[in-house]
Each structure stands twice: as structure tokens, then as C-alpha cells.
Amino acid sequence: MSAALATVLTFTTPALLSPLTASVPGRNPDAVMATPTAPARRLAVSLLGSVLLSGCHTTTPAQQAPASPAPAITESRIVATQPAATGPGLTPSQRLTALADTVTATPGDATTALPYTYLRTQSWTRATNAITRADLRQWRRDTDGSGQEKVRRLPDLPGLNHQPERHEPALFTRAPETTTEHLSGGLHPYLPEPLPDDAPILADMLASRELANEPAYPRLLANGVVALASTQYLNQAQRATSLRVLAAIPGITYRGQSADIVGRTGLTFTITADGSISQLLVDPRSGEILAAHEWLSGRRPGLFSAVLILERGHTTDTGTILRP
């Protein structure tokens, strides 16, 4: 293992062993953020996780590899999408590039002048011998890093073999809510703005090119893209760039069209590397990452982590909730 990869793994591995790692990509002491602080470093691999995607098999092209053992496949859906991204005979890289070339604007793209970036995620993450679960709403003032977080946690689930189920997202509404106010500098984006519009440069920021020959490199790139999308707002151009980063991941495969556990449909892409299987669900119109999960094999197999990215946009103040 190279010294550079050893450094990356030193940053990320402890996140799996803390009971609070899963949940709060903000300033919670055990959460993960995207600056050189300890919380920042841990998010890079804490936001991918279990069975958020379903129905990945019926529309999968025949030439693709078999579906991963991680998700429970229960339902298949056909998604209205850009014809270029789902045309016959395309490689996974060509599909992602075609989608990047045709991503559409979202309502949030028209509100970037508002002072607060708003994100809501639900996450499932491996701790030492359990899965932690949390619903996070975060408002971050872009000019100074102040803001607010509201977190709801469900009881930890013993063991590592849990796969998020359709009834779980609604359970968060019954959980007690904790509100944390952050002063200036308390919250950080995953990467500093403005993000580069060049995919190779963005990829190097997410996973150093020095690691390109390491078995973990595809996994690190995928984790980085999901962490980026989970913790800061990506506008139309930035979404296109992030899709081009995914398109360049070695060995990425296309699994067809599927739905996540809250019923949203998208295009499913899989990365198998370094003893893990990751799946990303991508909106076929906006290019937004809707959900992601990662499943580990090896000595302690099971769920690594999972994320549903439910709401994103911009608000005039904290506490304002946006609906998808």
C-alpha cells in the first residue's frame, strides 16, 4: 500500500467505528465535514450505504455484470429520461457523459443568490457493531459558515447486516429533534467554492491522482462524489462536472433503471472495488444523486453506509423547509 493511500485510510477508517459517524455531516463532534478538520475528513467514506435502490435487474443491459449481492431487489421501474443517456449500445462512461451533456436546471438553481444553502439527508452508517440512523436538516450561511442543524435519530440497530427498508424514512418523524446553532465558521462545505468546472481537476480534489493505481481508487472517487453531493449544493454545471468524474471511474457499470426506498426513480451505476460494492442512483433529468449505498465483503461483511439526499436548495433564513 502506498504512503498516500495509507494516509487516506487513516483519515476515513475511524469514522466507521464511532456510533455517531453516520448521521450528521455538520459540526457534530462525531460527524463528517469536508475541510481538513477531523469531522471533515471522515465524511469522505461515511455517506455510502445499504439497500436504497431496488429493481436494478430487469432493465439492465445483457452485457453487464450480475447485480450486486448487497441490495434486496424488489421492484423495477421505467424512467422518463434523456434518450441519449439510455440509448442502446452505450458504455457506462458514455451514458454518464451523455447525461452530463443534457442535465436540466432545478428550482434550486434559480435561488443560489439566497444566503443559506439547505440540505436534508437520511443516513444509515456502520458503527462498531451496529448501524446508526439519522435524519439531518442543515442550513449553512454561505458567506461565513454559520447556520443551524436539526437532527432526528432512530435507535441503533445491532449487527451490520441491516438493509434500510421502505418503512424506515417515515419513522424519523416520530423521533425527538435536536437543534444546534452554529456561529461563524461552524459549518463548512465539503470542498471550497467555487468548484472547478474541469472534471479531472475535481476528481483530483476528491481523490488524489497519486492513488490512481491503488485498488481503492474507484471507491474513493465514488465516495467523494457522493459526499460532495450530500453536503453542499451543486448547481447545473457542477452536477454535470460531477457526472463526468463518475464517467471516468475505472470499472463503473450501468445497472439499468430503478427506484429507491422512497419511490424516486433514476439510473443506477455500480462500482466494485477494494472489497466493496457501491451503487449510486442518479436523476435522469437533473443529474442529481438521489441515493447511494455501499456494501462491504471480507472479514466483517455488511452495510458500510447509506444516504438518501431528500431536499436541497437555498433559503432566506434558517428553519425554512424546502420540499422536493
For each feature predicted by the language model, list its residue ranges.
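A general, composition-driven signal for non-globular sequence regions
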Residues: T21-S23, D30-P36, A40-R41, V51, ...
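Intrinsically disordered, low-complexity prosegments and terminal tails associated
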Residues: C56-P324
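Secretory targeting and sorting signals
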Residues: M1-P19, A34-T60, L246
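Intrinsically disordered, low-complexity peptide-like regions
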Residues: F11, V24-N28, G55, L281, ...
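Terminal targeting segments of Actinobacterial cell-envelope proteins
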Residues: A15-A38, T59-T60, A65-I73, R77-I78
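Residue-level marker of intrinsically disordered, low-complexity segments enriched
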Residues: S2, A6, A22, D30-A31, ...
